[in-house]
Amino acid sequence: VAELRMGTKFHFTGFLKGDDVDHMYAISDVYVMPSVSEPFGIAPLEAVRHNTPVIISKQSGVAEVLNNAIKIDFWDVDAMADAIFGLLHYHSIARMFTELGADELKKLKWEHVAAKLVTVYEKTLAQRA
């Protein structure tokens, strides 16, 4: 970023908390989490909650849960660049991901997860009886 003199286009924030987190998502056009190993990152879900389109690596744990995000291979920097470019230049695609992501996030509430878990336990117990 520094070599290309693009520092004004990116935010490398380090640790943020509280209102600073909300502000950063509010001013961001795209959230990118290119982690090679992230058991489960909550940050992409926070980005979706703030209507920011998300790009995550296929290798991340959140990729198993979040369907309405662009998923790229961590090592494929060309695909990552293409995804960023696409979201920045094709607003209808970015809007589609934010709208579908918001709908998806509503289904990821703890109440729904708990209900699914209860169903799994009930089915397991019924099979053992």
Model-derived segments and their meaning:
Residues 1-16:
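Nucleotide-activated donor-binding/catalytic signature segment of Leloir-type glycosyltransferases, i.e.
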Residues 15-16, 23-28:
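Short alpha-helical donor nucleotide-sugar binding micro-motif in glycosyltransferases
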Residues 36:
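Aromatic "clamp/platform" in nucleotide-sugar-dependent glycosyltransferases that forms part
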Residues 41-44:
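Short glycine/serine-rich donor-binding loops of glycosyltransferases
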Residues 53-56:
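Short hydrophobic beta-strand element within catalytic cores of glycosyltransferases
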Residues 69-78, 86-91:
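Conserved acidic donor-binding segment of nucleotide-sugar-dependent glycosyltransferases
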Residues 92-122:
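A charged, aromatic-enriched C-terminal amphipathic alpha-helix characteristic of glycosyltransferases
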